[in-house]
Structures are given as structure tokens and as C-alpha cells.
Design a protein with these regions (language model features):
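Peptidyl-prolyl cis-trans isomerase
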Residues: 1-194
């Protein structure tokens, strides 16, 4: 019977949260949380921004491509790279405005994660060639394993933490409201021991 009541209560609280609790988290709250807790927000894996191309070894203009990917921030280079990728590449990922983990990257190129991490410490452009393809990785930004997470990467995690905190507070407030209303309407009476 207690188990059933707790299931009903949980279902009621879940519906209350979905219907009445605000889901948006203000930027200022995220920034404040980040500033206060950034030492606890540590990367468990290296993350990068940049671009990756997988190109057949016989593709034309490979040397020109290698020069263009060194400056992916230039709009004309990105346009040229995208046209090239559309025509010749077997794989193309542009992630200059989003973070990818090194484990996301090694799925796309023949390289061990530890080896990639070691290479990333020393260089921003990595080129690997096998019998069929050339793999070109250009890194525009990176944070190594053990570094503090950048706020752009930690944002979703922080929002989830803040929403969980808000949920706990919201449920407590709703319980208090129900408790006070029950006392006011006489549905709940308090007796004091003498």
C-alpha cells in the first residue's frame, strides 16, 4: 500500500513539474554556477573544435586543401573546402562551433585515442594516410583531459544540475502549500503533546 502511494505521489510530482515548473535556465545563473564550481568541472577526455576531412589519396588539389584547412576561420576557405568535400571527400565534418571528444574523432580516422591526445599536445594539424585515404584533422581550439571544462561545453551539464536543484525546491514548495492548505481547510489537524 505504501509503495502504491509513493508511485501515485511520484506520478503527481512528475506531472506538476512538467506543467508548472519553468524549464529555462538564465545565462546569468549558468555563468554564476560555472564561476563558483569550475574547479569541479574537469574534463575526463580531450575535446576539440575544428574540421576533419577524409579524402581519397588520388583526389586532385590535395596540397591546396592542406593549405586551406590551416585557416578554417576564413569564409572563402570554408566555401572552397565545402565544395572540395562535396566533390571528392568520403567524409567531412566541420565542428568549429561545437566540441567533439577525441573518442568521437577516432571513430572517423585510423588512430588510437592516446596517440591522438599525444599529437594534439604538439600540433594543430594532423595528417594520416593509409593505402586508400588521407585523413586531415585541423584543430581550431582544444582543451586537454584534466583541464577545466569551457563553459560552452559544460553548459548543458550545468543546466541539468540547476534544473534538478530547482525541481527539489519546487516540490518542497508545493508540498508546503498543500500542507498549509490542508491545515487552513481543516483537512489536517495538528495536536500538541502536553
Amino acid at each position: 500500500e505504501d509503495y502504491r502511494r509513493s508511485l501515485y505521489l511520484h506520478e503527481y510530482e512528475t506531472k506538476l513539474i512538467s506543467q508548472r515548473m519553468p524549464r529555462n535556465v538564465e545565462d546569468t545563473l549558468v555563468q554564476t554556477f560555472y564561476n563558483t564550481h569550475r574547479q569541479q568541472l574537469i574534463l575526463t577526455e580531450t575535446i576539440i573544435q575544428g574540421l576533419l576531412l577524409v579524402v581519397p589519396n588520388q583526389a586532385p588539389k590535395l596540397d591546396e586543401l592542406k593549405k586551406k584547412i590551416q585557416q578554417p576561420e576564413l569564409e572563402e576557405n570554408i566555401e572552397w573546402i565545402e565544395k572540395f568535400a562535396y566533390q571528392y571527400a568520403t567524409g567531412y565534418e566541420l565542428f568549429t562551433d561545437e566540441w567533439k571528444t577525441t573518442s568521437d574523432i577516432i571513430v572517423l580516422m585510423p588512430l588510437e585515442q592516446d596517440n591522438l591526445d599525444k599529437q594534439l599536445k604538439n600540433k594543430r594539424q594532423i595528417e594520416i594516410q593509409d593505402s586508400i585515404n588521407t585523413y586531415l584533422l585541423q584543430v581550431t581550439d582544444l582543451h586537454m583531459k584534466g583541464d577545466e571544462k569551457p563553459i560552452t561545453y559544460a553548459r548543458k551539464e550545468i543546466e541539468e544540475i540547476l534544473l534538478r536543484q530547482r525541481q527539489v525546491e519546487f516540490i518542497q514548495q508545493e508540498r508546503n502549500k498543500l500542507y498549509n492548505k490542508a491545515i487552513e481547510t481543516g483537512k489536517l489537524k495538528l495536536y500538541e503533546n502536553e
